[in-house]
Amino acid sequence: MTTLINRPNTALVVIDVQNGVVGEAYNRDNVVANIASLIDKARAADVDVVWVQDSGAGARDSEGWQLVSELSRREGEPLVQKDFADSFEETDLESILAERSVGQLVVAGAQTDECIRSTLHGAIARGYDATLVADAHTTEDLSEWGAPTPDLVIAHTNLYWSNHAAPGRTAGTVNSADVDFTIAPGV
């Protein structure tokens, strides 16, 4: 249960699903399709969809900076512009969530080992419950620089987040097919 008072609502947070971020990402098409399914489920359940866009993914308004063509933000859905891996750092994400009485986050997007991890930890540290959708996040292959392969990065993140906890807050993972936004609070 979130430690945030009077914040019973859930939001789907879609992080950095931009051409320049996921263009070469592992399992890109399946992950984007799973995110599209989550967006449809959230909208059908009248759950807020909050978009996060990395301003470092290329020049603003460039092709690389744009959200992928398979996903479309609706008018009125918040768009958070960020410069740091944690989507809360120096952005209006917290105020957007507070306005909507959100205390539970369902997180999807990219990059697993950067912005996904940082935002999940930032959410828990700020009092949110945070659920990672296990098959709806991805990363690029950085193994030539000594990183594990993307499938291992994703699997490791899913493993440790499925067991993460903090006083008064919940964390966990769920597959996109099992997300049910009609069950309060969260999935």
Predicted regions and their residues:
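Short acidic, Gly/Ser-rich segments with clustered Asp/Glu that frequently serve as metal-coordination loops
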Residues: 18-23
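Conserved GNAT-fold acetyl-CoA-binding loop/helix
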Residues: 26-27
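Active-site-adjacent betaalpha module
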Residues: 2-11, 33, 37-40, 44-45, ...
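N-terminal nucleotide-binding beta1-loop-alpha1 segment
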Residues: 13-17
